[in-house]
């Protein structure tokens, strides 16, 4: 009987240790969906025997002489210059104090109450105090710089371009992912086909990685469970 109990205890201990080693916690990606787009082929024109054709096929390799090279179609590329520098700080404090004191006694005690209230037995004194001090503060600073080439995946009705892109960098046994999405106004695109990220509307910038280094920085799901249950 004792042998079976020891065997069960050993199996339970190994199971608990294996569960504490699990570090997989599901997370929702900031940039969702496909991170690239293919050009949409145009309709095939019907030859009418005339020199002038009312409907010309879309030729993505054709570039007019007096036309800039800004992206305007689905599948065109654009370089985003990441220039994010955000800092924020917050502090608050509160103080509260309250003191109170009460005295009660008989100056003259009747003779028949001398045994009960005599010798200052009727004197009552009560005092109390309450003090509260609270202080809180938070500081946050984020800096992100670099370049990322994205693809136009949608042309909005007002001419703005919705762009998405992803860059993957493999370093040893880990992979770093940089994902970006947002809405670009074509007027903010420079002659070198670049636009700073500070001028992108609804910008979503995501920098994540996978591998053993990234897993070592995450808390195990069982530890996360007990952390939520802990009253401390």
Curated annotation (Swiss-Prot):
Cellular compartments annotated: Cell outer membrane; Bacterial flagellum basal body
Residue positions bearing lipid (N-palmitoyl cysteine): 22
Keywords linked to the UniProt accession: Bacterial flagellum, Cell outer membrane, Lipoprotein, Membrane, Palmitate, Signal
Extent of the signal sequence: 1-21
PANTHER family tied to this protein: FLAGELLAR L-RING PROTEIN
HAMAP family: FlgH (MF_00415)
Function recorded in the entry: Assembles around the rod to form the L-ring and probably protects the motor/basal body from shearing forces during rotation.
Name by which UniProt lists this protein: Flagellar L-ring protein
Annotated organism of origin: Shigella boydii serotype 4 (strain Sb227)
């Amino acid at each position: 009987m004792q042998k079976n109990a020891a065997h069960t205890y050993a199996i339970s201990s190994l199971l608990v240790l294996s569960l504490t080693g699990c570090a997989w916690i599901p997370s929702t990606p900031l940039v969702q969906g496909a991170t690239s787009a293919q050009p949409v082929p145009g309709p095939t024109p019907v030859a009418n025997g005339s020199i002038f054709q009312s409907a010309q096929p879309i030729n993505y390799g054709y570039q007019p002489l007096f036309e800039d090279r800004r992206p305007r179609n689905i599948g065109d590329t654009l370089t985003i210059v990441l220039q994010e520098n955000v800092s924020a700080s917050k502090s608050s404090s509160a103080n509260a104090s309250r003191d109170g004191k009460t005295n009660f006694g008989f100056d003259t005690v009747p003779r028949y109450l001398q045994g009960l209230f005599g010798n200052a037995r009727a004197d009552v004194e009560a005092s109390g105090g309450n003090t509260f001090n609270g202080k809180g503060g938070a500081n946050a600073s984020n800096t992100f710089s670099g370049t990322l080439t994205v693809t136009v995946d949608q042309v909005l009705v007002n001419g703005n371009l919705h762009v998405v892109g992803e860059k993957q960098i493999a370093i040893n046994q880990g992979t770093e992912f940089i994902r970006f999405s947002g809405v670009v106004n074509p007027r903010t695109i420079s002659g070198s086909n670049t636009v700073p990220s500070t001028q992108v509307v609804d910008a979503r910038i995501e920098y994540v990685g996978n591998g053993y280094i990234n897993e070592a920085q995450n808390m195990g799901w069982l530890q996360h469970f007990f952390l939520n249950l802990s009253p401390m």
